[in-house]
From Swiss-Prot:
Cysteine disulfide partners in this protein: C51-C65, C58-C69, C64-C73
Main location per the UniProt record: secreted
GO cellular component, one term: extracellular region
Stated name of the protein: Conotoxin VnMEKL-021
Organism from which the protein derives: Conus ventricosus
Record lineage: Eukaryota, Metazoa, Spiralia, Lophotrochozoa, Mollusca
Length: 76
């Protein structure tokens, strides 16, 4: 009787671990993590048109390649 109980417990553990491995675990959304992404320089961002060059008009620091906005993009 004890052997049967142990066998049933082992079978239950194996089935539960198999269900977790197949994807029955957590269902939370995974964030995209870019570990190997290359960070671009300000010049590369400007060249590709992703940001505004210095002395051009701006409304927020995110628009400027240097992230310094005072009505126009500044170098410092």
């Amino acid at each position: 009787m004890q052997k049967l109980t142990i066998l049933l417990l082992v079978a239950a553990v194996l089935m539960s671990t198999q269900a977790l491995i197949k994807g029955g675990g957590e269902k939370r959304p995974k964030e995209k993590i870019k570990f190997l992404s290359k960070r671009r320089t300000n010049a590369e961002r400007w060249w590709e048109g992703d940001c505004t060059g210095w002395l051009d008009g701006c409304t927020s620091p995110a628009e400027c390649c240097t992230a310094v906005c005072d009505a126009t993009c500044k170098l410092w």
